[in-house]
């Protein structure tokens, strides 16, 4: 098992000193989002935002045949026109045997990182800066659509490769496999080398070190890191999981003392269904704020095949989930962002402009909860809907992603292209987002 000493790696004394110095350093830097009195702030004022997930931003920004700088600027302009000022983006991607995954990726098992994609991230951040946007950059993934933790395990030979959704290895086999990552010292050494390179990077576009760029709001450890899929393995793996969150967050802060760090957790649905799990794994001062994801379809709270008869109960359960985690954030004295939420289209359609009756109701409900907590002076700083498809479109009649596709959308490769994402043709949803942005600005 990976020891706490191995995870911290850089030396406890140096990391502790770096962490202790963070508030002073961050406070002196204009334009950086920080934490004050359990809430996010920017230059002495509350930082509130309406955000979106644009995981593929670096791919669009890349100066290569697979990139599309012109589309990137159009998408950012459209998002800005809606009042979106915060984007959650992917800053990593690992080559893997996954049947459906992103290609190209930021890296393989060696240290020859893809400079074209890294330049794409430089371009994305520079374009966001022009529009006054902030970025949350996640640097790993629990799921295999970008390679993620399973790819690292595959490189180090830790067990047989498990494909997410493989009927030969039903749930929770994949999640238990991916969660082995936290205790794998070799896998984490590879991961930390990439993190050190990325966080310590200097932009090829602006010439500014990432650590000095206020466009970045936060570094995020991973997309939806879970301690396990099964309760049995989860209990055994919790010490490694908790130590990995604390150690990785401290490692990032030892490189960059100016930016916030978050975990990317879903909340207790991604922590063995336990609020205590969330508290224990996030009580470290190296984690600056809590994150929450709300997925009623994926969690079987609202049926994908019968939304009309299951929506009310599922929406009520989602509302309670949000409120419980707001209360949890208050009790911990930490800010909260609802950085993923979504609902499928009516009848599980995928086409742009197809009816989104229940999705629109769900968006309004989430936005109402956020606005209410903001008005009450609560810990909620903002939301990032999942996800922005914009002018991207499915390239195949069955709406499934195929290797080599370049019309990127927010729905990742393992899902139908259009399942949860918001297209530029979804007029009713765009209006709801725009109205929410106006309401947040008025608070």
Task: Describe the predicted segments one by one.
Residues 1, 19-30:
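C-terminal segment of N-terminal export signals and the immediately downstream linker at the start
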Residues 1-14:
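N-terminal secretory signal peptides and thylakoid transit peptides that target proteins
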Residues 14-22, 268, 343:
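Hydrophobic alpha-helical segments of integral membrane proteins
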Residues 32-302, 310-335, 341-368, 373-436, ...:
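Active-site mouth of glycoside hydrolases
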Residues 306:
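Acidic-aromatic pocket-rim loops
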